[in-house]
């Protein structure tokens, strides 16, 4: 190596571990044995990413001492959805496809298990043509002139 200068030096290196190998339990334990800093963190609720998250304040719900539950869709609204859907000749799956939701969402709303979401209720209202919110539940939606 007496004749080596920066231009002619050959460096032989082992390739580093791939991302999957670096995350393995074996690699983590080996790094800990060598005394290296190892940072591990879990993704929170990664497999349960939902389109419509519940926006109710859960901390407020925890502090409350009386009724410990979120308001659910009333059975009256569920029946109106069901009747409106059937009058249009739609199945739960057809209605869900029409409003870009999962069939389970429609089933939950019809059975009264769902926590009301104004976006979803608005889409269902437009699809079946019946009001689901306010005091005139079950009445047809009047299509008036739109303001520009």
UniProtKB/Swiss-Prot annotation:
Compositional bias per record (Polar residues), positions renumbered to this chain: 48-58
Region ranges (Interaction with TBP and NR5A1): 69-108
Recorded consequence of changing residue 65 to D: No effect on CALM-binding. No effect
Gene Ontology CC: one annotated term: nucleoplasm
Pfam families per record: HTH_3 (PF01381), MBF1 (PF08523)
InterPro entries to which the protein is assigned, alphabetical: Cro/C1-type_HTH, Lambda_DNA-bd_dom_sf, MBF1_N
Domain HTH cro/C1-type residue range list: 81-135
Swiss-Prot/TrEMBL domain comment: The IQ motif, which is involved in calmodulin binding, overlaps with the binding domain for nuclear receptors and transcription factors. Its phosphorylation probably allows a switch between the two activities of the protein.
Task performed by this protein: Transcriptional coactivator stimulating NR5A1 and ligand-dependent NR1H3/LXRA and PPARG transcriptional activities. Enhances the DNA-binding activity of ATF1, ATF2, CREB1 and NR5A1. Regulates nitric oxid synthase activity probably by sequestering calmodulin in the cytoplasm. May function in endothelial cells differentiation, hormone-induced cardiomyocytes hypertrophy and lipid metabolism.
The protein's name in its UniProt record: Endothelial differentiation-related factor 1
Naturally occurring in which organism (per UniProt): Homo sapiens
Gene name tied to this protein: EDF1
């Amino acid at each position: 190596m007496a004749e080596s200068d920066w231009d002619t030096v050959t460096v032989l290196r082992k390739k580093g571990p791939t991302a999957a190998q670096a995350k393995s339990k074996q690699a983590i334990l080996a790094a800990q044995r060598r005394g290296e800093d190892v940072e591990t963190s879990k993704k929170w609720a990664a497999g349960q990413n939902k389109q419509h998250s519940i926006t109710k304040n859960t901390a407020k719900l925890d502090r409350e001492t009386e009724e410990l539950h979120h308001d659910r869709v009333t059975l009256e609204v569920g029946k109106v959805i069901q009747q409106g859907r059937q009058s249009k000749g739609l199945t739960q799956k057809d209605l869900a496809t029409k409003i870009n939701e999962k069939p389970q969402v429609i089933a939950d709303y019809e059975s009264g298990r769902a926590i009301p979401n104004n976006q979803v209720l608005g889409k269902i209202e437009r699809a079946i043509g019946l009001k689901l919110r306010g005091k005139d539940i079950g009445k047809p939606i009047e299509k008036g002139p739109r303001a520009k």
